[in-house]
UniProtKB/Swiss-Prot annotation:
The chain crosses the membrane at residues 246-266, 311-331, 375-395, 397-417. Belongs to the RTX prokaryotic toxin (TC 1.C.11) family. It comes from Pasteurella aerogenes. Keywords: Calcium, Cytolysis, Host cell membrane, Host membrane, Lipoprotein, Membrane, Repeat, Secreted, Toxin, Transmembrane, Transmembrane helix, Virulence. This is Exotoxin PaxA. GO terms for molecular function: calcium ion binding; channel activity; toxin activity. The transmembrane domains are believed to be involved in pore formation in target cells. The Gly-rich region is probably involved in calcium binding, which is required for target cell-binding and cytolytic activity.
Length: 1049
């Protein structure tokens, strides 16, 4: 290993030792400074013992002819010295002058004489006059003597503490007697102590210089290897950001007048000569007079140890200093200023909206950044000095005491600065608090509430397009929109920084009116209280005279009042606890005369209380009680329990707009139509909107503030037993959730929608209307004339007794009716199975390969060219008269075949993609059943009877084209068909169709029949006023007519 490498390794080791010793010095200093004035005497005595161990006590020297009652309060200083056990010596001025000359003591208040360490009263008086801030602390010789005495003791004991660190390891008695290098070393230490005290008093004189220096840092380190990123960040700091005075930096000294040189040392690519030059510059400029004193002290130490003081030694010191400088500490400084800049840009908008709190927060980070930058940079420079001292003392027998000496000094300064930092930051925070209080006195309003007001104004500006669309979306003339301005990070942080967490609320609710998509002008403050009272939990829109939407645009916190208490939980820790006096009910009075829409989906009804492994998440529930008016209302419920008094009109309750849990709707105990009990399971993965207590943390230096607030979150309930229970009164229609719901109807008419999920709907008695919607649903009409709509999915529909209408919709459905009523069964898309009852049924398989069984009674089947491969199995009585209607086909284009016992119809065009129609067991006899269809009618009114087909197959037909076998076109066939079909449809659904007049044109009669068929598909819309689910229309106009030959019967 080269000599230079070995030297660097040794330097790194020495630097690390110096850092550890510096840390110890800081810790010792912190422990000493935290006691306050009451411990001043103990500190002074301890420091005196440290000095006395190696030399005489500290002596306050006062000329005999010096008037202690003049000047800046030396009467108090003399008394303080006596109280602290410091000797006060009055000597002739001539003796004092001789002592100065013989010992080379300059015109400073600290010195070395034959008596030992000496405080020179005149020089100290002059010093205090020059530094008014220190002088003001001491005060005059009149006034509060006890208080001034304590302050005087603080000054003197502080000087003793400094001297105790500086002179540790030096025997002053021997140094004074022997003179020489030891005496020079001691004098250098005293000089250093004087500079330390002096610099602390210099105030803000060089803050602007510091502003320029930190800019130079960025320029220098931007090009230094390994420090480019730091340099770029520092360049973002505005030069003017650090140039302001009056920021609470009164005790920051001018330690940084030449700190630029330290970054030159950090450039590992710089030449040795450059580092040497930078090292000398650092020695003379980095921290002003202190660095010069440290340099003198290092040189004196090296002379005392017989070590070299040449250029290479200086380079060695400079190299060690470079290792001690950590630019990473400046990243936090840059982050503070960048955060201030970001907040300031954000604040500009809200300042225009009447709130300046964001600017105040930006000011805090700006000023805190200045303080932090100053102290960080000073500490970095002091670390470099400690490392340089360690390098200078390397190899010396007195190295360890000397290193301890300097690290003690730097530790002392760092401790003073660190303990000064907190009061400075608190001073800045206090100024912000004062501004807030002044604003509140002027405007008579809570400052943070004003911040929420500004946030809401911005929300309206940003969301106007969305808010304006609600009138049209919900089809109402007026929209009453309630918006919760939730907890705001910046507003909360300002409350924490200023210690006013007990003055802030978790947010604020607002009410806005929109008509015809336009925002109405704001009314006075009492407007909100009329519509919404969040403290009492009351909402009232009963005065609205038009159709109205009540919508909670954002989640609304539960009703009640908040209170907060700020408590100190540690030396620098404060917690502002939140207490909520909650109301367990929302009460809503709706529009009296007009229809309205009530969207409660963003109403928070669950307050999170606690969590445990055994019981899961626990909640307090807030129940919704709503009293509506006479109009047709729509109510969208949230996840909590509700009591809905719907009033007159056709009212609908929706559970599908948010996750309301699995439903069990029960109307079996109802004594009035529209009364239901709804039980909801909110366990497992059910997502509920819940209110939780969160906390925001902010810091002011060492002070940590935690403020609790209410917020909302959408989360799994986490409670396997959590339920909600609704009581619905006078509700005509219920829309289910997106879970597997169960509906049990009443003895009255029920209208249920399963919505998403595999639902079970049972209408029980009454003329019910059931919709499965999406999912594989099961619908049971039971007794009564029911309408069942499967919707999407593979559904099962059971009509029960009565005249029923069943529509499978999409999917592979199964439809079945009982009894001898008139029933309509429509399969829709998919491969369906349709089973009629003992009465007259209409069976339309729709698209797909369907199976149709009419059962007993006079049944009516429909087949189209788009129907796929259908199978009809009619197991009726011999007296039955069943009909097959070929909606868009003619006999001329069909072939008929006997396949086993089945009658099969196929397109005459063998290449056609159309399906076939099989009438199962047509030719089967016995068992007492009739499997034939008595008549088959095509789109033009031509008819085939079962006898015609019997004759056809018993003879020797020239062709299987049915056109040769069917009767001639006859309009009376279509007229009769229309009558039969109309009877079934009108009985099953009571469609209220107008009677069709006679029409001699067969095409018109065909259209009338198709109108009867297609009218079924529009029944839901006609009956439900648009709220139902329509049927698939009949497809009767798009088939391709196949050519064929027709034979006259």
């Amino acid at each position: 290993m080269s000599t230079w490498s070995s030297m660097l390794a040794d330097l790194r080791k020495q630097a690390e030792i110096a850092k550890q010793q510096a840390k110890k010095g800081i810790d010792v200093t912190k422990n000493g400074l935290q006691y306050g004035v009451s411990q001043v005497k103990l500190q002074a005595l301890a420091a005196g013992k440290s000095i006395q161990k190696y030399g005489n006590k500290l002596v306050l020297v006062i000329p005999k002819d010096y008037d202690v009652n003049t000047g800046n309060g030396f009467f108090d200083l003399a008394k303080a010295a006596e109280e602290l056990g410091i000797q006060v010596k009055y000597i002739d001025r001539n003796d004092l002058e001789i002592a100065h000359k013989s010992l080379g003591v300059t015109d400073q208040f600290l010195g070395l004489t034959e008596r030992g360490l000496t405080l020179f009263a005149p020089q100290l008086d002059k010093f205090l006059q020059q530094h008014s801030k220190i002088s003001n602390v001491v005060g005059s010789s009149t006034g509060d003597t006890v208080n001034k005495l304590a302050k005087s003791q603080a000054i003197i004991s502080g000087v003793q503490s400094v001297l105790g660190s500086v002179l540790a390891g030096i025997n002053l008695n021997e140094a004074i007697i022997s003179g020489g290098s030891e005496l020079e070393l001691a004098k250098a230490g005293v000089d250093l102590a004087s500079e330390l005290v002096g610099n602390i008093a210099k105030g803000t004189a060089t803050i602007e210089a510091f502003s320029e220096q930190i800019q130079n840092f960025g320029k220098l380190v931007q090009n230094a290897k390994g420090l480019g990123g730091v340099g770029q960040q520092l360049q973002h700091i505005s030069g003017s950001a650090l140039s302001k005075t009056g920021l609470g930096l009164d005790i920051i000294s001018s330690l940084l007048s030449g700190v630029t040189a330290s970054f030159t040392l950090a450039d590992k690519n710089a030449s040795t000569s450059t580092k040497v030059a930078a090292g000398f510059e650092l020695s003379n400029q980095v921290i002003g007079g202190i660095t010069k004193a440290v340099s003198s002290y290092i040189l004196a130490q090296r002379l005392a140890a017989g070590l070299s003081t040449t250029g290479p030694a200086a380079a060695l010191i400079a190299s060690s200093i470079s290792l001690a400088i950590s630019p990473l500490s400046f990243l936090r400084v840059a982050d503070n200023f960048n955060r201030s800049k970001d907040i300031r840009e954000f604040a500009e908008r809200f300042k225009k909206l009447g709130y300046e709190g964001d600017k105040l927060l930006s000011d805090f980070y700006h000023e805190a950044g200045t303080i932090d930058a100053s102290i960080t940079t000073i500490s970095t420079a002091l670390s470099a000095i400690a490392a340089g001292t360690a390098a200078a003392s390397a190899g010396a027998l007195v190295g360890a005491p000397i290193t301890l000496l300097v690290t003690g000094i730097t530790g002392l300064i760092s401790g003073i600065l660190e303990f000064s930092k907190q009061p400075m930051l608190e001073h800045v925070a206090s100024k912000l608090g004062t501004k807030i209080e002044e604003w509140e006195r002027k405007y008579g309003k809570n400052y943070f509430e004003n911040g929420y007001d500004a946030r809401h104004k911005a929300f309206l500006e940003d969301s106007l397009s969305l808010l304006s669309s609600f009138n049209k979306q919900y089809e109402t003339e007026r929209a009453v929109l309630i918006t919760q301005q939730r907890w705001d990070e910046y507003i909360g942080e300002l409350a924490g920084v200023t210690g006013k967490g007990d003055k802030i609320s978790s947010g604020k609710a607002y009410v806005d009116y929109f008509e015809e998509g336009k925002l109405l002008a704001k009314k006075p403050d009492d407007f909100n209280r009329v519509i919404l009272d969040p403290k009492k939990g009351k909402i009232d829109i009963s005065n609205s005279q038009t159709s109205t939407l009540l919508k909670f645009v954002t989640p609304l916190l539960t009703p009640g009042t908040e209170s907060r208490k700020r408590t100190q939980t540690g030396k620098y820790e404060y917690v502002t606890k939140l207490d909520v006096n909650g109301i367990n009910q929302w009460e809503v009075n709706g529009v009296k005369e007009k229809g309205a829409v009530y969207d409660f989906t963003n109403l928070i009804q669950h307050v999170h209380i606690s969590s445990s492994v055994a019981r899961g998440e626990e909640y307090r529930e807030v129940r919704l009680v709503s009293r509506l008016g006479k109009g047709n209302d729509k109510v969208f419920l949230a996840s909590g329990s509700a009591e809905i008094h719907a009033g007159d009109g056709h009212d609908v309750v929706y559970y599908d707009k948010t996750d309301t849990g699995l439903l069990m709707v029960d109307g079996t105990q109802a004594t009035k139509q529209g009364d239901y009990t709804v039980t909801r399971e909110l366990s497992g993965a059910t997502q509920i909107l819940r209110e939780v207590v969160k906390n925001q943390k902010s810091s002011v230096g060492s002070r940590q503030e935690t403020v609790e607030y209410r917020d909302n979150e959408l989360a799994q309930s986490g409670n396997s037993n959590l339920k909600a229970k609704d009581n619905l009164y006078s509700v005509e229609e219920i829309i289910g959730s997106n879970h597997r719901d169960e509906f049990k109807g009443s003895k009255f008419r029920d209208i249920f929608h399963g919505a998403d999920g595999d639902d079970l709907l049972n209408g029980n008695d009454g003329d019910d209307i059931l919709y499965g919607d999406k999912g594989n649903d099961e619908l049971r009409g039971d007794n009564g004339n029911d309408q069942l709509y499967g919707g999407e999915g593979n559904d099962k529909l059971f009509g029960g007794n009565g005249n029923n209408y069943l529509s499978g919709g999409d999917g592979d459905d199964e439809l079945q009716v009982l009894g001898n009523g008139f029933n309509v069964l429509r399969g829709g898309k998919g491969n369906d199975k349709l089973y009629g009852g003992a009465g007259s049924d209409f069976l339309d398989g729709g698209e797909g390969d369907d199976y149709l069984a009419g059962g007993e009674g006079n049944d009516f089947y429909v087949y189209r060219s788009t129907s796929g491969n259908h199978t009809i199995y009619d197991q009726g009585k011999s007296s039955d008269s069943d009909t097959l209607y070929l909606s868009d086909l003619t006999f001329d284009r069909l072939l008929v075949e006997k396949v086993d016992n089945n009658l099969v119809f196929k397109p005459s065009d063998h290449n056609s993609n159309r399906g076939s129609l099989t009438i199962k067991d047509w030719f089967k006899t016995g068992h007492g059943y009739n499997h034939k269809l008595e008549q088959i009618v095509d789109k033009n009114g031509r008819k085939l009877t079962s006898d015609n087909l019997e004759t056809h197959f018993n003879g020797t037909p020239k062709t299987n084209l049915l056109g040769y076998t069917a009767e001639n076109q006859n309009e009376s066939n279509l007229s009769s068909l229309k009558t039969e079909l109309g009877k079934i449809i009108s009985s099953a659904g009571n469609f209220g169709l107008a009677k069709q007049g006679n029409n001699n044109h067969s095409a018109a009669l065909n259209n009338d029949v198709d109108k009867l068929i297609s009218s079924a598909s529009s029944f839901a819309t006609a009956q439900m006023g648009g709220s139902g689910i329509g049927l698939l229309p009949s497809n009767n106009a798009n088939s391709t007519i196949l050519s064929g030959l027709a034979r006259t019967a």
